């Protein structure tokens, strides 16, 4: 336990530590002491466990031993990366004063706070993934949500209307750190989220938020950003911005605007849909065999991040989509020359963020210079394009000749990692720096001349002049000649076989050289900071250029993918419907060793629902998912895996595909399935694309069939959504006879004895059978079990012929168990009767008795 009440009982150094720690009680404090960052007390115990480092003790303070752990300053980034990956935050406390001139403890100050959502150091970040800080506010009328990518300055807000929409946003953005008010009611919404930070209520106050935002953007109000009335979003944005400023301990000039995201601007997908379509993460949590895995061949990290944002937020803006399609077509002839140039641009977006935070390192500026050298070649390659959008992009890319020349003059070709050791500023950039460096560099020549002169004066041929970091410059002689030294030689150090001396002239030169080195280093650091001041006025244009270059990377990547994977340009139509010829699943096609069987699809006003039947493993789920992925690709502006595609207006994509128990929330497979189904039935519209796969299979046959039937009726009749409805309930294949706009299709299969061949080909009409037993045999179910199953199947088919269709036909079905009918007396008597124990006379008597009971 730390005694913080009586600070006087502690040593001066520990008093300083405890005061700083009191300002950051909930996070680890890295306290700089010489070449180490030290942690004390509970921080030391926690850090030793988290980072697997030794826990020691540092004497005592206030009569108590002090637990201590430490990490070397030169390896601190590795330890920070480990802590951040574990969701920890760290306050970095540096020595500000000079130990040589300070009496008592050297002055220290927390210079930055490293948190999972506010990282900018490349060593701590996944370069091909956004790293977002988010804030959430809940009110009776909905939610406010804000996200900030501090590595780009991208600041977005939205107002999800309900819990499902908020959950979808959290799943889409996947923030590294999430701020929430201490009064948040729905804690279940965020309970499994990483990097949770509970914040006081006052940080979400509306007036404070407005003040924070107008101050940041230098405006009188927020009308120009379209968020003045978005009060829920404003609360979240205000808290987020305050937190970012507190952690960075500097201004944030690269955050220059906030954008309100509106639901109607993009295709809405809920959390289940994003998960089931495996856009950037597969169902196992990895990145392999996802849509992004197939599509992402971008050559810059910032391009890769932009592509993933497009995949998670397809746009409905027809102008934007047309521009992208035209650009992809135009770039197909230039991909081979353009991509190597873009690769050399690198991650300009994050370099600029570090510039804005004044944490850019020498190699960041060298990368920026190298990026600028590629711009003229990019401009020359793409100039003169006839399509309208590429010239706009090139205009935003710019060339920055002045800045390129500045960095070429200022920074050496291959600078060191850090500026603190010097050797960053190029010779010729600053005359005074060159002069101080010349003094330090001329030491070798001077020492050679001095050594030669002293040898001649003394006649001692073994005399040498040298230098070491501890004792400075010296004249060295062997022990055997030490009695011959002149009287003005002053002994500095005695070694086993030699003596070292200093003379006034050498001492004077030593002082001069050491002074020149320290002055050169101080001047170099000042010149390096001055470079920031020269670059920062161009930050807005540089950010615009980085965004344009990232988009150019995405478009050229999509051009390469279209060419390599034989994708075609879809038509985005204002008329309702989806028409696809030769459609293919982009991921399955990519991983298959044999040719993929392409299939058509037509949905229109007269054909709004497809009832899809066919065998397990026949390709029903693949067919449904490929439709959703083709639509999604069309709405990011990409070409699509098909021979031809025309896509009408789409507002939402829903999937009810597969399910598993949600043990963490205590929900069964069937409950998960029904929750997702309810969400679809409440929120789908006539412009929605709905995929329903095997609904109702998690309960009894008749319950499941009834639910599937009623759901299909609602989607086709009331909602009129464009629906692909896969089922094994063959009773549903009678729906087209009862409802307009419903059509049967099936996936073909051919049986050969006990084996089955899946044709993966979509045909009109219903499937003739399910082939479930053939699939079971393929899976290795024992032969005797399959044989018995075939016998039982024949019995069941005989018993239930025609029964199921009648049981589900009707305008409305109750989801509740019907009231149980009382058993008739005659039936009860018959059940209790043993006919084998009756004589012929008794049997006749029982027959008359039963007749009376009816």
Curated annotation (Swiss-Prot):
Keywords assigned: ATP-binding, DNA damage, DNA repair, DNA-binding, Nucleotide-binding
Gene3D superfamilies: 1.10.1420.10, 6.10.140.430, DNA repair protein MutS, domain I (3.40.1170.10), MutS, connector domain (3.30.420.110), P-loop containing nucleotide triphosphate hydrolases (3.40.50.300)
GO process terms (BP): mismatch repair
GO CC terms in record: cytosol
UniProt cross-references to SMART domains, sorted A to Z: MUTSac, MUTSd
Statement: the UniProt record of this protein carries the keyword ATP-binding: yes
GO molecular function, a single term: ATP binding
Family: Belongs to the DNA mismatch repair MutS family.
NCBIfam families membership: mutS1, PRK05399.1
Function field: This protein is involved in the repair of mismatches in DNA. It is possible that it carries out the mismatch recognition step. This protein has a weak ATPase activity.
Name under which the protein is recorded: DNA mismatch repair protein MutS
Native organism: Sodalis glossinidius (strain morsitans)
Gene that this sequence comes from: mutS
